[in-house]
Structure formats: C-alpha cells, structure tokens
C-alpha cells in the first residue's frame, strides 16, 4: 500500500506506521474494516564494528555497545511486536534492517557481510517463536502460550 512520509492517507492495503521508539498501543496501527495493520519499519538499533563499515560518518537511530545488548534488544523488540500481533491485530512488521548500508549501521550483519552483529541463535529462536504464534492465531479455536526459553 501507499504510505506518505507523515501520516496515513487512508488508501492502500495497509494501515502503516514507521516506529523507531517503543512498540505499544499508542504508536502501533490497528487494522480497520478494509486494511491490515503493519509496522512498516522498526528497530534502527546500531552497532559499530570497526573495519567493516562504509568509510564515512555512520549513524543509527540508537547505537548499542556490544553484540549481546544488540541481540537482547532485538529479542525485546520482537516480543513487543508479537504482543501487538496478538492483542492489536498487526499483520506485518519490518525490521530495519537486514544489513548495514552506506551511512547506516542498523543491520544484522556488517556492510561487507563479514561479521554477524547479533547472536543468530537468539534471532532465529524469537523469529521462529513469532511464526509459531502467527500459525496458532490462524488456527480456529486455539489458545496461545507465550512462555519460551531462549538460547544463551
């Protein structure tokens, strides 16, 4: 669907919002009677990895200090997205971003694709858990249990 830079024009297939702050009911769209809800961009958490960045001043919405904090922050954000999926009806959420790009260090991997910036066991576990929750939401008469154990 179409999305203006600021605000929802009311057309397209999605009620969409880009959100780089807390993920909660106040700043997450809800579906309406004709459109699904999506968080079109979220995350924006960065990590400097010297020697693996585009050779200019790099930025991010928030710079974190190490791989484990970045990984745990990703898990926290995905748990929040899952809550909005279950209790607000969000159908899609797009993490910014999969790889570092020119000027931005928000990726899961570095610009040169040589360094994994997050603990991918944790990333995989939360991603799979959310996919399972989505599957259960689509089963008629199912109940959801959201307790889980994450890899260290």
Model-inferred region functions:
Residues 1-14:
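Active-site neighborhood of glycoside hydrolase catalytic domains
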Residues 8, 22-29:
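Acidic-and-aromatic substrate-binding clefts and catalytic sites of carbohydrate-active enzymes
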Residues 11-19, 35-37:
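Active-site regions of enzymes building and remodeling cell-envelope glycoconjugates
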Residues 19-22, 43:
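Short, acidic/turn-prone active-site loops that include or flank metal/cofactor-
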Residues 26-152:
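Substrate-binding clefts and catalytic carboxylate motifs of secreted carbohydrate-active enzymes
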């Amino acid at each position: 669907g179409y999305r203006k830079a600021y605000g929802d024009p009311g057309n397209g297939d999605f009620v969409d919002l880009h959100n780089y702050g807390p993920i909660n009911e106040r700043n997450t769209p809800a579906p309406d009677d004709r459109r699904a809800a999506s968080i079109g961009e979220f995350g924006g958490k960065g990590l400097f990895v010297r020697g693996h960045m585009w050779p200019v001043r790099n930025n991010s919405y928030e710079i974190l200090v190490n791989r484990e904090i970045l990984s745990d922050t990703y898990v926290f954000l995905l748990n929040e997205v899952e809550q909005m999926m279950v209790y607000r009806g969000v159908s899609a959420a797009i993490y910014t971003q999969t790889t570092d790009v020119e000027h931005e260090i928000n990726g899961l991997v570095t610009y040169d694709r040589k360094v994994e910036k997050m603990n991918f066991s944790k990333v995989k576990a939360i991603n799979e858990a959310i996919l399972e929750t989505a599957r259960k939401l689509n089963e008629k008469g199912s109940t959801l249990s959201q307790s889980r154990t994450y890899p260290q």
